[in-house]
A protein has these predicted regions:
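Short, small/acidic-rich helices and loops at N termini and domain boundaries
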Residues: 1-28
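Glycine-biased, small-residue-rich flexible motifs in mid-sequence functional cores and linkers
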Residues: 25-232
Length: 232
C-alpha cells in the first residue's frame, strides 16, 4: 500500500500518461485471470487495446533458436485459433515469441506482448517494428516504468505475467533446460492448461516438449486440440 502513496508512483504515472496507460490492482478493469496468480503485479503500464487482457488467450512460448518445424506448426495451428477470437500472448523475445506475434498479426489476429523493460525500450532491438505494430494492432504491457533497461531478473518475472494472462499455455519447441519449461510450470501452478507440440525424439529442440507430454501435458496435433481447452 505504501507504494501507491509514494512520490515514486506519482512520478511514474505522470511520465506514462502521454505514452500509454497505467493499471493498478485496485482498478475494476484489472485483468481477472492475472489477479488470481500468486504474485500479481501491483501496477503495470500498457500501450494498445486494453480489452484484449480479458479476452480468451493462448500463451505461446518456446526456444529462442527454433527450427523450421516450429514455424510450420504455428502456421498450421494459429489461423483456426485466431478465427475463434482467441488472442495470443508471449514475451516479444527472439525465437518462438516473435514468431507467434508475427504470425498472429499476419493472420489479422490479436496479440499481447509482455516485456521486461519500460515501454519506451525494445529488447531485442530487432523487434522495434514488431513492438510498434503490436501497440497499434494489439497491446504491449510491462510492470516496469519508462526508461527501465532489460535486466536479467526481469524476464522470469515477466513470465509469470504471460502465464497469468492465459487460459492455456502452448510450448512449441524447447530444450530440456529451457526457460519455457519454467513458464510452463508457473502455468501449471496457477491451474492453467499446459499444452505441448510433440517433436522428433532425436531433436534437442523437442526434448522439453516431449518430456512435458510424458509428465501429463496435452499433446497438440491440430488446432482442434487447443480449441477443446477453450470449450469451442
Amino acid at each position: 500500500m505504501a507504494y501507491f502513496l509514494s512520490d515514486g508512483l506519482t512520478k511514474e504515472v505522470e511520465e506514462n500518461k502521454n505514452y500509454g496507460g497505467i493499471c493498478t490492482i485496485f482498478d475494476e478493469d484489472y485483468p481477472v485471470l492475472l489477479k488470481e496468480i500468486y504474485n500479481p503485479p501491483l501496477v503495470f503500464f500498457y500501450n494498445g487495446n486494453f480489452s484484449l487482457l480479458n479476452a480468451p488467450t493462448l500463451a505461446i512460448v518456446g526456444a529462442r533458436k527454433h527450427s523450421p518445424y516450429a514455424k510450420e506448426v504455428l502456421k498450421k495451428l494459429l489461423p483456426d485459433i485466431l478465427d475463434e477470437g482467441i488472442a495470443t500472448v508471449s514475451g516479444l523475445a527472439k525465437g518462438i515469441d516473435s514468431l507467434a506475434h508475427k504470425i498472429t498479426l499476419s493472420e489479422k489476429g490479436k496479440t499481447i506482448g509482455v516485456i521486461g523493460t519500460g515501454l519506451d525500450r525494445t529488447y531485442p532491438r530487432e523487434n522495434f517494428e514488431l513492438q510498434a505494430n503490436m501497440e497499434k494492432e494489439g497491446i504491449v504491457l510491462s510492470e516496469y516504468a519508462l526508461g527501465q533497461k532489460p535486466l536479467r531478473f526481469h524476464f522470469p518475472a515477466r513470465n509469470r505475467i504471460i502465464s497469468g494472462l492465459c487460459q492455456s499455455l502452448l510450448v512449441v519447441e524447447a530444450r530440456r533446460q529451457s526457460g519455457s519449461l519454467i513458464t510452463a510450470n508457473m502455468a501449471l501452478q496457477e491451474n492453467r492448461n499446459v499444452l505441448a507440440v510433440p517433436g522428433n525424439i532425436n531433436s534437442i529442440l523437442s526434448e522439453g516438449c516431449n518430456e512435458l507430454i510424458l509428465e501429463g501435458a496435452k499433446p497438440i496435433l491440430r488446432a482442434e486440440d487447443i480449441l477443446e481447452e477453450f470449450k469451442i
